[in-house]
Amino acid sequence: MPQDTNTALFKVIPQQLPEAEDGLEAIFELVAAGLYSLASMLLGEGEESVRLVEEAVANAEVSVCQDPQVARESSRRDLCAAALKVLAQRDPESLAAPAGLAPASVCIEEDDLASAGISSEELEGMIAGPERDRVREWLESLPTWIRVVFVLRAVAGFSAAETAALLRTHGGPDAAAWTPDAAREVFRQGLCSLASQLLQASAAR
């Protein structure tokens, strides 16, 4: 099994953080903007995603720690945990660990974005740029459990072990059997689907 890789599609807060004199308001805005994009990929756009972002930012206690990195990590994890709970409430079986999952013969051998023929910067540009709607339509076409694993790994930047732990802890009883190996294999399936989409888009040009 390939070693785990932490392939964040984009950072929840952009690398260029505001100077201290810019105040905490700018930090809140940066945190919230990245978190909403993440929430909408997990839950869809709308009031529910907005609510989870507000709660995650509040729980990050930015005003206390005044550390953007700590705020980013805390709010990102809080939001993903809350989103998993919402998904489990919507459909308890949607986050169930796939039974009897074994390494399949798919087009991607490694569990990283490079194996799909795209860099994290390129995919970040697709999500934020003109290809945004097409990328989101592709994500929405995936089964919930594949979409969630893909977003947690590629977008939020969690490792396979962290992804499995989040699903077990917050995905409801049906998600109790998730393992790091299962998260790796499902992520590979998502990467294979992404590679197929990229090939189709390239052929259509």
Locations of regions flagged by a protein language model:
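Short amphipathic alpha helix immediately N-terminal
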Residues: 137-166
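Short amphipathic alpha-helical boundary/capping segments
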Residues: 12-14, 122-127, 133-142, 194-201
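Short, aromatic/basic-enriched loop-to-helix "N-cap" motif that marks the start
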Residues: 47-51, 63-82, 176-180
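Sigma70-family region 2
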Residues: 16-18, 53-74, 91-94
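A short, charge-rich alpha-helical start-of-domain segment used by transcription regulators
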Residues: 2-37, 47, 61
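Short, small-hydrophobic-rich alpha-helical interface motif
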Residues: 31, 35, 39, 52-61, ...
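Arg/Lys-rich amphipathic alpha helix in sigma70-family domain 2
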Residues: 68-70, 79-114
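DNA-recognition helix of helix-turn-helix
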Residues: 161, 165-205
